[in-house]
Each structure stands twice: as C-alpha cells, then as structure tokens.
Amino acid sequence: MSSSETKGRNEEDVAEIKKAIATGAVKDPSNLSAIPPIFVVSGANFSMNFLLLCIQSSVCCACVFAVKKLGIISFRDFDMKDAKMWFPISFLLVSVIYTGSKSLQYLSIPVYTIFKNLTIILIAYGEVLWFGGRVTALTFVSFIFMVISSIIAAWSDVQSALASSIPGASSGVSVGAMQSLFGALRGLNVGYFWMLVNCLTSAAYVLSMRKRIKSTGFSDWDTMFYNNLLSIPVLAVFSLIAEDWGRENLNRNFPAETRNFLLFAIAFSGAAAVGISYTTAWCVRVTSSTTYSMVGALNKLPVAASGMLFFGDPVTVGSVSAVGVGFFAGIVYAVAKNNQKKNERRQAADAIIPMASRKP
C-alpha cells in the first residue's frame, strides 16, 4: 500500500472517530472511558469489541476489589442469590451493545442517533407503567425538540444516502440500478429491525436496572460491582461465538509493534470506567431512568460544539442549529422537571394539612 493510500485511510479513521464521539456511537454507559477505547478501536483492523469490553469489565472489578481491600469503599460480598437476580440486567446490557453494533452495520451513525433519542420517550412511558411516573406536556415537548435536534444533525447524511441509493432520472432505470436500490432497501430493513430491537433492549435495560436497584436495596457500589462482574461471562461467550479467535485475526487486532501499548490502553480505560459505572448507578437511583437517558443524549452536544470550536469540524447552519435546538431541549426538560417537583411538593403539603386549617 502506498503512503498516500495509508494517509487517506488514517484520515478516514480520524474522521469516523470524531463523528462517533460527536454522535455518541458508543452506547455502553459502563464503559465510556473516552480516549483509551477510542484509540484501541480506531485501527482499521480492530474487530474484537466484545473481548475489549470483557477485559475492561475485568479490570474494573479488579480495581474495585483492590480499593475495597484498602478499606476506602465497602460493598456486599458476592452472593449467588443477588447474582441470579442481577444477571438479566447484565445480559440486557450486552444485548444493547450487540444489537447496537448490528444496526450500525446497516444504518449511518446520525440515523442511529435519531432512533436512540426516540428511546427516551419509550423509557419515559415505561416509567409511567412501572413506577407510576408522569409525563407532563412540557416534558414531552422537550423530547420532541431533542428528536428534532437529531434530525437536523443527520439531515445532510440522510440526503446523501438517499441520493447515492436512488438512480437519477438522467441515467435511466437499469437492471443493475434497480438491483442496487433493492439491495440498499433490504439492508435498511435489516438495519431498522436491529434498531428496533436495540431500542427495546435499551429501554428494558435502564428500566429493569432501576427496578432491581429498588428491590435488592443495592448501593451504588453494589450496582457497579455486579453489573461489571456478571457482564464478564456474557461478554466472553459473545466474543467466542461472534468473533474470530484465529491466530491471523489476533495478530491483526493486536499487532506485535503496538500490542503492549494497546493492552495498557484497554487496562487504563477499564480503570477509568469505575467512576463512570458508579455515577451511572447513582444517577439512575437518585433521579430516574428518563433523566439518565436525557443526560446521555445531552452530553453529545458539548462534544459536538467543541469539535466545531477547537477541532476544525465544519460549522454549518445545520450543525449549529442542531446543537442549539438540543441545548434548548435540555433547558425545557430541566424546567419541566422543576415544575413537576414543585407540584409534587405542593400536593404532599396539602395532603398533610388538616382540612380545617387550610386557607380558602
């Protein structure tokens, strides 16, 4: 391969990494450790993502065990009864990762992000059914603005995808063009199927985790520990089944010249995931599944804005509008939740004041 081809591939890799960061292509909340995993998976030949996540979870558990031995933190000792209750949550987490990777094989990252943000609405109404939550009109408006933000950000990519798949009128409708179009539509149908499964498993994971935290009385460290520990065997099985463990593929994923640094980066990202896993459990426990998902959608916006300000990403009307509408959606959601809390406190106060003492 010539040096110019190598340079071109590297530039494409960098562009894809920045795109993934800005749109939140990585969807595992317990393993988002920023730069180290991005470095590992950014190589054109890296394909063993389940192995990567398995090693990260193992390192995460080892770090927590070490800190517990030092007496800095405390959490429950491993209990088989608790493990059986929590295992479905860990399995759902791995299912979210797998279905997300399958849908990304057929759909572009912006389209994927639109549907992931639609999951927020699914989670909100799941909380209504499971936890007696309430979706106010203003909260629903914030969901709509978040989806609009994603559509604006993805519009140029959607247009280019449609233009490339639909033959132009001037070129005529040939058999090859029609076959190409039907192939693209077939791929989209498969992609939308995996996307639907991903949205359902994502909602089930977040809602089930909150429900299980309440039923088991887990602390944040308990949640973090069991989530990572029970993910290890599931990730290992997925890796053995879905990934190529041949010598040639292992050498391609872990080349000898960078192997030690790659393993160090994976280990470092696993250690960094401790804080992210803990704060994830804390957020779901003290707020709600909907708020956690909304924050997950909002955290892409500062990254996208910094990409335009500091890293040379193209500043267009669409990109600026998408970030602006997204921030507006966050403000509307915050106002809606604040108003909802005030109403709940007012209703609670009215419930405990005797009728004779109430002012007209």
UniProtKB/Swiss-Prot annotation:
TM region positions: 50-67, 85-105, 111-131, 135-155, 165-185, 187-207, 221-241, 261-281, 292-312, 315-335
GO annotation terms (biological process): transmembrane transport
Transmembrane recorded as keyword: yes
UniProt cross-references to InterPro entries, sorted A to Z: SCL35B1-4/HUT1 (IPR013657), TPT_transporter (IPR050186)
Membrane topology annotation: Multi-pass membrane protein
Any one GO CC term of the record: Golgi membrane
UniProt keywords, alphabetically: Cytoplasmic vesicle, Endoplasmic reticulum, Golgi apparatus, Membrane, Sugar transport, Transmembrane, Transmembrane helix, Transport
Protein purpose: Involved in the import of GDP-mannose from the cytoplasm into the Golgi lumen.
Quaternary structure annotation from Swiss-Prot or TrEMBL: Homooligomer.
Name of protein: GDP-mannose transporter
Chain's gene name: VRG4
